[in-house]
Amino acid sequence: KQPESRRVEGKTWLLIDAVQDPGNIGTMIRTADSAGLDAVIVGEGSVDIYNAKVLRAAQGSHFHLPIIRGNLHQWIEKLEQNNIPIYGTALKNAVSMYEVTPVDKFALIVGNEGQGVNEELLRKTVKNLYIPIYGKSESLNVSVATGILLYYLRRP
């Protein structure tokens, strides 16, 4: 059963905006679990978190941390009220992840495979981050980028 909690509990959050590939969502849930995050909020336009492929990719992480479907705008307001800084992911108007020092509390918003994070959500962040790419590839898969950023922000 999906958690009903609407309270902000915990210090580290992953917010997922309109990610459509079940393998990506499942991998991000599993990665958030592995990185020790407190909760995952899955926004509108994202694939069903109980899709068979999501469950397979998550490898049981649904049982380890709260995964809540919700309105990301409302959740961002709640997180801000609890002094949790919100970081977005973007290619424009963003700073390298290396310009941010690790923090003990944060929320990270990651976005749709083709469109990225919704512009309205990006305007609500304290900073938008990008991952430097040193090779010839133009981008990273959203679940891979999520893992890199979560572990970077969580490092001691």
Language-model features and meaning:
Residues S34-A35, I49, K53-S61, E119-P156:
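Structured adenosyl-cofactor binding patch, chiefly the S-adenosyl-L-methionine
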Residues G88-S137, N141:
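Active-site/ligand-binding-proximal alpha/beta "capping" segment
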Residues K1, S5-N93:
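RNA substrate-binding interface of SAM-dependent RNA methyltransferases
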